[in-house]
Swiss-Prot record:
Induction profile: By brassinolide.
Subcellular location: Secreted; Secreted, Extracellular space; Secreted, Extracellular space, Apoplast
Keywords noted in UniProt: Apoplast, Secreted, Signal
Protein name, as recorded: Protein EXORDIUM-like 1
InterPro entries: EXORDIUM-like
Deletion consequences: No visible phenotype under normal growth conditions, but mutant plants show diminished biomass production under low carbon and energy conditions.
Similarity remark: Belongs to the EXORDIUM family.
Amino acid sequence: MASFVMGYFLLFAVAFMCLDARTDKTQDYTSFQYHKGALLTGDVSINLIWYGKFKPSQRAIVTDFVASLSSSRRSTMAQNPSVATWWKTVEKYYQFRKMTTTRGLSLSLGEQILDQGYSMGKSLTEKNLKDLAAKGGQSYAVNVVLTSADVTVQGFCMNRCGSHGTGSGSGKKGSRFAYIWVGNSETQCPGQCAWPFHAPVYGPQSPPLVAPNNDVGLDGMVINLASLMAATATNPFGDGYYQGPKTAPLEAGSACTGVYGKGSYPGYAGELLVDATTGGSYNVKGLNGRKYLLPALFDPKTDSCSTLF
């Protein structure tokens, strides 16, 4: 079966040129359409496949984020703005579609697979990513491949910071599974894939923000993972919600690249909260006292980029 792969472009030369138009509520988003395909539904596990060297503290940054998305844990997150509140924009796509089924989407942290021995080497192709993703469970799951800072990936830093797509399942004929890949850009291209925690390669050179978890690479990965999670939920197989050509669409997260808070403009992420102790900038809170900076998502009901405050 032919597979679908969509790279998540976070090249800020493009983002800076487009940001003003994307944050303008008068912008015409009528081409942001539902293309009659499936959305993710049901109880879905997020399996994490760690490729390369990650410290336990680094893995915890991501696992706490994924766990914060879980609907079963939302009652423990009374403080707003929260990761769960941010995810509610994704839920609007299900309401907007007027789904006939009562099944929505419930996410939970699934299994974790550690590949610290670089079983496929330190230079990966798209096929390698799919093979790694296939190691996770394929039933009601999204398999997330996370590559460490010393691993190069085809297209990484040149035209993408991560991607989502589908692979052929190992079950019945015609089955397929969704996967995500995100790379740690800290030593390779932080100005492209970890802004605003690093000065951008192009555009206005405002001082970088302090990463909320004191890890430019991992906090940048969370930004990209969050956007790709939203895209995977609303366009898992390439025929869900998106704007523009199918080969290079704008999706729920990528339609709002570079927007994190109200008042954003090229070189400025927008109005954010700042931790009084660490100086880290953030816009949501998660489990275990975590704070994250998450991207604005495209709101299908208001036809605009939705920020939390």
